[in-house]
């Protein structure tokens, strides 16, 4: 289940109560090394911060002839946000500081609360 959820960025929560510790510790000792290969581990505070940021982000994409302008608006400064894109789309101009591109995605490591990126679109996508 955790692998299937990871494929689309889902959340896998393990909640353990301390009433029967031996079996639960054994479970954690077995599952954590397997999950670490592809999962992020965080505290409840980190998860809450992530959820608050996720809930406050909106993305708008507008097509103008041979380009697409992607605008990201956020209630909080944007940190650690990945946008999955068509692998043929390429940024038209240099990206702002804190933003990186690889085919199929734009990663926003750190930005303010609004960011626009102009992408070249192949003719077949228009």
Language model segments and positions:
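C-terminal beta-sandwich/jelly-roll accessory domains of carbohydrate-active enzymes
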Residues: 56-126
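A structural signal for short secondary-structure junctions
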Residues: 4-8, 34, 51-52, 62-66, ...
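Proline/serine/threonine-rich low-complexity linkers at boundaries of modular beta-sandwich domains
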Residues: 47-56
């Amino acid at each position: 289940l955790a692998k299937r959820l990871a494929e689309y960025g889902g959340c896998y929560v393990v909640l353990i109560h301390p009433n029967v510790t031996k079996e639960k510790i054994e479970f954690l000792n077995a599952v954590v090394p397997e999950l670490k290969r592809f999962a992020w581990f965080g505290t409840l505070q980190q998860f809450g911060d992530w959820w608050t940021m996720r809930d406050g982000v909106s993305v708008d994409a507008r097509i103008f002839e041979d380009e697409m302008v992607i605008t990201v608006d956020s209630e909080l400064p944007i940190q650690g946000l990945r946008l999955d894109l068509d692998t043929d789309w390429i940024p038209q101009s240099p990206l702002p500081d804190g933003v990186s591109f690889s085919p199929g995605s734009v990663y926003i490591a750190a930005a303010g609360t609004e960011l626009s990126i102009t992408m070249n679109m192949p003719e077949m996508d228009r």
